[in-house]
């Protein structure tokens, strides 16, 4: 089941969890979507600002698998 997250802090906390497996980053002309696969849910964060999206991408944990989908 997918769940949408509105806050960046909540998203980064979910990314640091032990059951977080992978992050998919989908870039559109208007927004960027970050999708974290955890054991039970798929969490999604939608960001309109491209600079903010780059900062979030740099803030992801280094052990997490990151895949960019275009």
UniProtKB/Swiss-Prot annotation:
A GO molecular function term, named singly, is:
structural constituent of ribosome
Belongs to which family?
Belongs to the eukaryotic ribosomal protein eL38 family.
Pfam families for this protein: Ribosomal_L38e
Keyword field contains Transcription = no
> InterPro entries from the entry?
Ribosomal_eL38, Ribosomal_eL38_sf
Report what the protein is called.
Large ribosomal subunit protein eL38
* Example GO BP: cytoplasmic translation
* Superkingdom of origin: Eukaryota
Q: Note the Gene3D superfamilies from the entry.
A: 3.30.720.90
Q: Which gene encodes it?
A: RpL38
Q: Does the keyword Ribosomal protein apply?
A: yes
Keywords of the record: Ribonucleoprotein, Ribosomal protein
GO cellular component terms given for this protein: cytosolic large ribosomal subunit; cytosolic ribosome
